Structure formats: C-alpha cells, structure tokens
C-alpha cells in the first residue's frame, strides 16, 4: 500500500521536460551505460523530500523499487536505505550491508552509486576486512568497480588512504 502511494507521488511530481534532459544526461540510449532507464524528471531535493515520508518501507519494497527500470524509484530506495542504515544498530546495519551487496545489479548508474555506497558499504567496512572491495574492483561491471572506489570515501574521511590507493591502482590497469 505504501509502495503504491510512493509510486503515485513520484508520478504526480514528474516533469516530462526534465525527464527528457535526464534521459540524455544519464546516457539512456541504445548501447549507452544507462540504456533502458526511465526518468520521471524529479529534481534531487524533491526526491529526498519524498523519500522522508517513506522511511518505514521494508527491505522487500525497497528491493522492488531497486528492480524497477524507473531511475527515480531506485534513487528513492537508496535514500531510504541509507536513512535506515544510519539509524540502525550493528545487526540491522549488517542486514542492510548484505541487502546492498545482493542488489548490486540494480545499482547501475553513477549517481545511484555515489549517493549510497560510501554511506553503507564504506561505513560498514571502516573497522572490518575490506576484501569485498577488491572483488568488486576486478569485476567486469562498471558500477561494481565504481562502488569499490567510491566506498573508500568513508575510509578517506578517517585519514585511511591505504585501500583507496590500492584499489585505484587496480582500476587504472
């Protein structure tokens, strides 16, 4: 029920002119990196405002949003997921970390990666083994490689550059 309400609110806030510009900017044409993604033309502040109303959506509903080909739905799902993560105990943070990793195929554009991975993957790994980042760094998938690097921002903020430098070397090879 809440999921349908959210989708309805997104459609009500759509802007076809902005959507067309976003489709071009995010390279959604055939053969481009964002191929097949649909944009509703909602600006980021508005998406964040809408997301705040739906922070109680469960992981199953967030999975449905991430599986959508509507980019704005994915974006909102990640904003909500980051909010849940930030306000959770260690057990729930682990669940959200695992959920994120299990849904990497759907985190498939640079803005989706950049708004979320360092706040979830990076933050979770600050005091843990970071092997998963090295696995992502050697992936064939562009977005997994980007996640491996951007997640390091959480470490860099704590003056820990070691993994960022190692991963950057992997990525430039």
Predicted regions mapped to residue ranges:
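Alpha-helical scaffold domains
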Residues: 1-173
């Amino acid at each position: 029920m809440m999921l349908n309400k959210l989708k309805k609110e997104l459609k009500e806030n759509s802007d076809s002119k902005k959507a067309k510009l976003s489709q071009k900017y995010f390279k959604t044409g055939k053969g481009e990196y964002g191929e097949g993604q649909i944009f509703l033309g909602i600006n980021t502040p508005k998406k964040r405002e809408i997301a705040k109303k739906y922070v109680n959506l469960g992981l199953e509903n967030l999975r449905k949003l991430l599986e959508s080909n509507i980019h704005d739905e994915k974006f909102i799902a990640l904003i909500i997921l980051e909010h849940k993560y930030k306000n959770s105990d260690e057990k729930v943070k682990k669940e959200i970390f695992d959920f994120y990793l299990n849904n990497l195929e759907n985190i498939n554009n640079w803005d989706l990666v950049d708004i979320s991975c360092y706040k979830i993957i990076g933050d979770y790994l600050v005091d843990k083994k970071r092997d998963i980042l090295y696995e992502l760094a050697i992936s064939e998938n562009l977005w997994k490689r980007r996640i491996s690097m951007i997640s390091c921002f959480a470490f860099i903020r704590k003056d820990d550059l070691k993994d960022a430098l190692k991963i950057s070397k992997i990525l430039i090879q």
